């Protein structure tokens, strides 16, 4: 018989830097899951990635206090900020000038990396989503 799922926990954890402090500890502790076991498994799975890169993770908690987790690709905003060379997006989008620039080639590159996590049929559709995210962050998308 399959294990009974008691809940899903969605977190964004820096790659290779998971520790039992908040937000991980309290989120897993509420479900009675072994926090240190998750920390060890997550850090081992993300050891080959760039340290500190935010990794979305979905943890499935089971009734017998076991868990499984799935890591996703980093958020679009992380890739856009890295490509534009900025620390954060604009606080006043549209009123002030753009805070950074990315090329369509960089957008397509981000789209291919994020394709499996996006709800798009092709890379061009994913690229359009990323252009929208860039605009909302105050990043200008230029051809080239």
From Swiss-Prot:
PROSITE patterns: RIBOSOMAL_L11. GO terms for molecular function: large ribosomal subunit rRNA binding; structural constituent of ribosome. One or more lysine residues are methylated. One of its GO terms (cellular component) is cytosolic large ribosomal subunit. The keyword Cell membrane does not apply. CDD domains: Ribosomal_L11. The keyword Ribosomal protein applies. Belongs to the universal ribosomal protein uL11 family. NCBIfam families: L11_bact. Part of the ribosomal stalk of the 50S ribosomal subunit. Interacts with L10 and the large rRNA to form the base of the stalk. L10 forms an elongated spine to which L12 dimers bind in a sequential fashion forming a multimeric L10(L12)X complex. Forms part of the ribosomal stalk which helps the ribosome interact with GTP-bound translation factors. This is Large ribosomal subunit protein uL11. The lineage of its organism: Bacteria, Pseudomonadati, Pseudomonadota, Alphaproteobacteria, Rhodospirillales.
């Amino acid at each position: 018989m399959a294990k009974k799922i008691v809940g899903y926990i969605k977190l964004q954890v820096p790659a290779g830097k998971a520790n039992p402090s908040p937000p991980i500890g309290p989120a897993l502790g509420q479900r009675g899951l072994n926090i240190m076991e998750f920390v060890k498994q997550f850090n081992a799975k993300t050891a080959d990635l760039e340290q500190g890169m935010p990794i979305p993770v979905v943890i499935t908690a089971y009734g017998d206090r076991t868990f499984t987790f799935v890591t996703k690709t980093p958020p679009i905003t992380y890739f856009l900020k890295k490509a534009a060379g900025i620390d954060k997006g604009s606080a006043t989008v549209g009123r002030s000038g753009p805070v950074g620039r990315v090329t369509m080639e960089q957008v397509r590159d981000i789209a291919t990396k994020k394709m499996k996590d996006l709800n798009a049929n092709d890379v061009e559709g994913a690229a359009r989503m990323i252009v929208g995210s860039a605009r909302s962050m105050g990043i200008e998308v230029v051809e080239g």
